[in-house]
Regions:
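Glycine-rich, often proline-containing surface loops adjacent to acidic residues and nearby aromatics
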Residues: 63-64, 92-95, 124-133, 179-197, ...
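Hydrophobic, aromatic-enriched interface-forming segments
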Residues: 150, 154-200
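Internal mixed beta-strand/loop scaffold within catalytic domains of large alpha/beta enzymes
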Residues: 51-128
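TerminUS-proximal long segments
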Residues: 2-4, 259-317
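An amphipathic alpha-helical core segment
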Residues: 165, 169-187, 219-264
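Short conserved micro-motifs at the rims of enzyme active sites and ligand-binding pockets
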Residues: 78-80, 197-198, 253-259, 277
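Gly/Pro-rich turn-and-neighbor structural signature
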Residues: 5-83, 191, 195-227, 231-241
């Protein structure tokens, strides 16, 4: 957080997020052939939301790309737990959040969000990132995802990608399962480095790299043949997604605590999910390979860039 004289401009941030929402919805709708719905939902104190939801498409079974601009008299607990000195203060926030659940199990789920808070009169910070959750991972896809993530961070220092990558691994982790949600990406919070202008530039760079990170992967996997076995595994892995969003995610808790429209808060949940008691993958199967080799933090750029396979998890060795 900062109280820098480099004055924050919530209007500029809000405008960028709204433009990014339109760009991403248009690109994904072009791939699927079905448009996103559009709503304008007024909020208290002059705030508003624009949820755009995709449902029942050919490529995507469900998805949402949502913009919100909130104004409140007291910062919700989920937004101040890392900075308790801000609890109870008035705030203004804008955010874009997206999640796409594909039908094809070989197409990874992707999630991204960017947010900006002003608390009181001078304290502000950015947050967000993007992450990838494959059921049947391909090394070239994981490598491309992290190379693009690194490219997004490169103008802001060589240390930025490793830091945001490590924070992503730590955040998108299910401790009750002892596994990561997917293969990671970028995550940052309370970001003010370099003042508002540079922090906003980094936020825009990450936002501008979302489609270049995901569309090539989508294009490679969209026509991959799949059957009942792969679909069953997709529904099983979606359960992990639901567990994280409902039990762990700070964004979900913030949405519930801030009084946001419940349909928008829970729009990220997958449309169909299965849980199986004590399910175990077949030894030697692709399903076991995901569990044993991918659901742990790894240095993907060094590992896959050198042509090496991902390491087996320590708990299964």
């Amino acid at each position: 957080m900062t109280t820098s004289t480099d004055q924050p401009d919530v209007t500029a941030v809000s405008s960028y997020f709204e433009t990014l929402q339109a760009t991403i919805c248009d690109a994904l709708a072009e791939v699927d052939g079905q448009p996103f719905s559009t709503e304008e939902v007024p909020g208290p104190n002059g705030g508003h939301a624009r949820p755009r939801v995709h449902s029942g498409g050919v490529v995507f079974e469900k998805g949402a790309v949502q913009f919100t601009h909130s104004v409140g008299s007291a910062l919700p607990a989920a937004a101040s737990e890392r900075n308790p000195e801000l609890a109870g203060q008035g705030f203004e926030a804008c955010a874009i959040s997206m999640i796409m659940h594909p039908r094809n199990p070989y197409v990874p789920v992707f999630h991204a969000n960017l947010r900006f808070f002003i608390v009181g009169s001078t304290t502000w910070y950015f947050g967000g990132g993007f992450d990838l959750t494959p059921c049947y991972p391909f090394d070239e896809d994981v490598l491309h995802w992290h190379q693009t993530a690194r490219d997004a961070c490169a103008p802001f220092g060589e240390d930025v990608y490793p830091r945001l990558k490590a924070d992503c691994d730590a955040y998108f982790y299910l401790p009750h399962r002892e596994e990561t949600r997917g293969v990671g990406g970028l995550f940052f919070d309370d970001w003010t480095e370099g003042g508002f202008t540079q922090s906003f530039a980094m936020c825009r760079s990450i936002g501008d790299h979302i489609l270049p990170a995901y569309l090539p992967i989508l294009g490679r996997r969209i026509a991959h043949v799949w059957g009942e076995r792969e679909e069953a595994f997709l529904l099983y892995r979606r359960g992990r997604y639901a567990e994280f969003n409902l039990a762990i995610d700070r964004g979900t808790r913030y949405g519930l605590q801030s009084g946001r429209r419940i349909e928008s808060v829970l729009a990220s949940l997958p449309p169909r999910v299965n849980w199986h008691y004590n399910w175990q993958p077949e030894p030697g199967s692709p399903e076991e390979y995901l569990t044993e080799h991918y659901l742990k933090p790894q240095d993907w750029l060094s590992l896959l860039g050198a042509g090496k396979p991902p390491a087996q998890s320590k708990t299964s060795e």
